[in-house]
Amino acid sequence: SNKQLNFLQHIYRSLKNNGKARAAVVLPDNVLFADGDGEKIRRDLLDKCNLHTILRLPTGIFYAQGVKTNVLFFTRGKTDKGNTKEVWIYDLRNDMPSFGKTNPLKPEHFDDFIACYADGDLSKRKETYSEENPNGRWRKFSIQDILARDKTSLDITWMKTESDTDNYTFAELLDQIKEKSQNIAKAVSELEQLIGEVEE
C-alpha cells in the first residue's frame, strides 16, 4: 500500500548521506513489486542507498497467516546516484515448514543466513546458488539484472519445489487474480486506445 511505500521512503531519506547510516526494515511483498509510485521509490532507493541484502521471510510470522514479508538491509550513500551495485537475496521462505504457534520460528533458523550475511562484508560473501545447486538459498543479482526486470521488481524467486502451487492461501490466490486482472484491464484499455487511433 502507499503507507508502506511512504514508510520505506521516509526511512531511507531520513538517513544521513555519509555512507555509514544504515537500516533494516520489515516490509510486505507488495512493496517489492507494486507499480507506479512503487517502481519510482524502488529506483530511488537503489540510487540513494546501497540496498545490499533482502531476506525473504517465511510466510505469516509478522502479520496475519498468509502475509509474506521481507527484511531490506540498506546503507545510505554519500551521493544520490548509483549506490547499489548488487543485491544479495536469501530465501528463507521456499521449501520451509509453516511457522506459527505450534511451530515457532527460532533463532537457529537464521544461522545459515547470518553466516552467509558475513557481517555485511560483501567481499566475504559466497553464493550458495549455482547451476549445479539451483535451490541454493543465497544468490546475488547485479544492479543491471534488477533494473532490467519488469517494474524494477525486487520480488525475485528462483527456488523450485513440488509444493510451490500448494502454498497459497485463498486470500493470496485472490490477490494474484486481482493483480493479473488489473494488468489485463490496463492492457485491454491501451489496446482499445491504439485501435481507436488507427481507425481515426
Language model features with spans:
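A conserved structural/catalytic subdomain of Rossmann-like adenosyl-cofactor enzymes
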Residues: 1-200
